[in-house]
Amino acid sequence: MHTRIKTMYLIHHSHTDIGTDLQEQVVYNHVNNIRQAMAIIQYGIEHNTPEKDFVWNCETYYCVECFLNAASADEKETFFELVRRGNIGLSGTYLNFNDLADRGALFRRTASMQKTCTEYGAPVTCAMNADINGISMGGRDALIENGISFLYTNIHTHHGMYPLYKNQRPYWWEAENGKRLLVWNGEHYNLGNALGLNSNTNVSFNPNEPFFQTDAENPDYLNNLHANLEHRLSAYEADGYPYDFAIASISGVSSDNAPPNPALIYNVNAFNARFGNE
């Protein structure tokens, strides 16, 4: 691959969207997503298969809270054991709010989240925000004051694009009291799906985007993925992107509230086996 960007970090998650279905159904899906992720990881650990390295990221704490309310004591212990092991990631974001949510409510939910997770030996230091362009200063302060030091954002490309026309950029967001939050201004929350990292999807979220192509003459999705990555990473460099890594969020399927997909780790391993020395 002819770019200096040699590492792509994948954030495998289920985008939390409580407006796409009955909220009871959305809650059921996310509780089940967590249980599925736990089963995938435990299978890998018990059988020493690639699934032992599977990582599932809970985009919002609301989903975790619903799971904990439904889980048995053993399930809770197993869940946080996998968090401590690094197989499950937690986010300090309660839900993907617009700026109508007030600071007091956000602070209370974030503090409650941090208290619960810390009691299980898994304090939260990162947060993820997806599909909502922008976050209020009250939301920023609620994160900072409750021990969150890093915020990873994913834009909604239908309602707006990248600030200052620059994507994949970090910046410090400083509060009035001088405390700071490191923010990564990321891409769309299904970038990995659009690139073709899941062999069952290669659909662009932006119809004007020239980078996502499928070679109809070549059914091998790994070659398509390689071409898509080359185009995308080259475009970053042409735009002055200074780092040797990039980040892509990816869902199990190209949908909101999607389940975990263990095929992803096999796809990544297959890609690295073929192209990892480039």
Model-based region annotation:
Residues M1-E278:
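Catalytic-domain carbohydrate-binding cleft regions of carbohydrate-active enzymes
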